[in-house]
Amino acid sequence: MTRSLKKNPFVANNLLKKINKLNTKAEKEIIITWSRASTIIPIMVGHTIAIHNGKEHLPIYITDRMVGHKLGEFAPTLNFRGHAKSDNRSRR
C-alpha cells in the first residue's frame, strides 16, 4: 500500500539536516546514512549519499530520475552467488 498523499514523504531528520547544511554552503561531499527508508526528494539531487547495505556503505549519486524512490532501493542487501553446482562425479 502506498503512502497517503496528505502525508509528506518520509525523510530522516538527521539526513535532511545534513542535506540542507550542504545546500546552504554549496558544497558536495559524501553523506553517510543508515536510513534506507528515506524517500529521495528534489533537494537531494546532485549529492552523493553512502547508503548502508548491512555490511558497508555504498556511495550512490542522486539523479533527478531517482526522486520519489527510497534510498534502500539502490543499495542491494543480498548477494546472490548462483545455485549450487550439480556435481554428479562426487555422488558416485
From Swiss-Prot:
Classification via HAMAP family: Ribosomal_uS19
Organism: Lactuca sativa (Garden lettuce)
Subcellular location: Plastid, Chloroplast
GO BP terms in the entry: translation
Lineage: Eukaryota, Viridiplantae, Streptophyta, Embryophyta, Tracheophyta
Pfam families: Ribosomal_S19
InterPro entries assigned: Ribosomal_uS19, Ribosomal_uS19_bac-type, Ribosomal_uS19_CS, Ribosomal_uS19_SF
A GO CC annotation given for this chain: small ribosomal subunit
Keywords: Chloroplast, Plastid, Ribonucleoprotein, Ribosomal protein, RNA-binding, rRNA-binding
Protein's name according to its UniProt entry: Small ribosomal subunit protein uS19c
Family: Belongs to the universal ribosomal protein uS19 family.
NCBIfam families (UniProt xref): rpsS_bact (TIGR01050)
Function: Protein S19 forms a complex with S13 that binds strongly to the 16S ribosomal RNA.
GO molecular function: rRNA binding; structural constituent of ribosome
Annotated PROSITE patterns: RIBOSOMAL_S19
